[in-house]
Amino acid sequence: MTEILVVANRTLGGEKLIALARSRAQAVQDVSFRLVVPQSKPTAGLVIYDEAVRESAQIRVDLALTRAAQEGMRASGEVGDPDPFLATMDAIALRRPDEIIISTHPATQSGWLRRDLIERIHNASGLPVEHVVTDLDREGLPFGVTLVIASKTSSGEELIERLRVKAAEDERPRLFIAVVPLQDGSGDAPREARARLAAMLDKLQGAGLLASGMTGDPDPYTAAVNALELFRVDEVVISTLPNQRSGWLRSNLIGRVQHATSAKVEHVVVDVDDASAGIASTAA
């Protein structure tokens, strides 16, 4: 079996990379793809949680593997070292691929190219390396991406139904990336946020939506800005409790996120009685 190692991060959903993988799958009778997504920290926020950074890379892996399966491709994937050179060399040592595809932004935007990643990988591995340049600013993505920020209301029926309608109305495939901010810096906060996230994803995927997610910074604004730094999205949905009970609304979260992005920002109100129950929480 021929194995092709694919290394990409923010350009992972680019049509050129997808087209190249598709052509390889058609040209080679018995081929599999191994995806490596190096971790990438956002610049916003005073504290960046390592687990959240890793989760964001895992989202890319999960969604890419789902897309590959839809294309009929045999693929597996992993989150890699933050250094793309080390991430690639680790995968080469473990998997012993036959060739490598590396996807980057154009030279003027790519930190990987400024560090001569393509040449270094070729020289160190001795393997064929194909470089795919994806200019997302010009080309866009072949699917829509909705960022969803929610905490206590994350499993609310109003929110799930609104997202289901969005997917049904869009002519393109639509991906949903959920971010559930931690409640605080306590030891139980990550567990509680992961439980909320799991319940939300179970409902979204049960409704037939292509969704993945991560926990985020305790400050919902920082969680949103970090996600906007990590992912290219065309819309943001923020779900809160009703006005008088929402700390997020009292802090003007909707307006602040609107100022931080050119993407459309939509607010979905969910009453606590309709939301996920059983996990202690501050008002979202």
Q: Residue ranges of each PLM-predicted region?
A:
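Short helix-loop-beta junction
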Residues: 63-73, 169, 199-209
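Structural beta-alpha unit
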Residues: 71-99, 209-235
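Small/aliphatic-rich secondary-structure junction motif
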Residues: 1-48, 131-134, 142-191, 267-270
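Structural motif
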Residues: 3, 99-101, 145, 235-237
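Glycine-rich, Arg-bearing micro-motifs that act as flexible, cationic patches
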Residues: 104-119, 240-255
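Short, surface-exposed alpha-helical segments at coil->helix boundaries
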Residues: 54-62, 115-118, 190-198, 251-254
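Short, flexible loop segments at boundaries between secondary-structure elements
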Residues: 126-140, 262-280
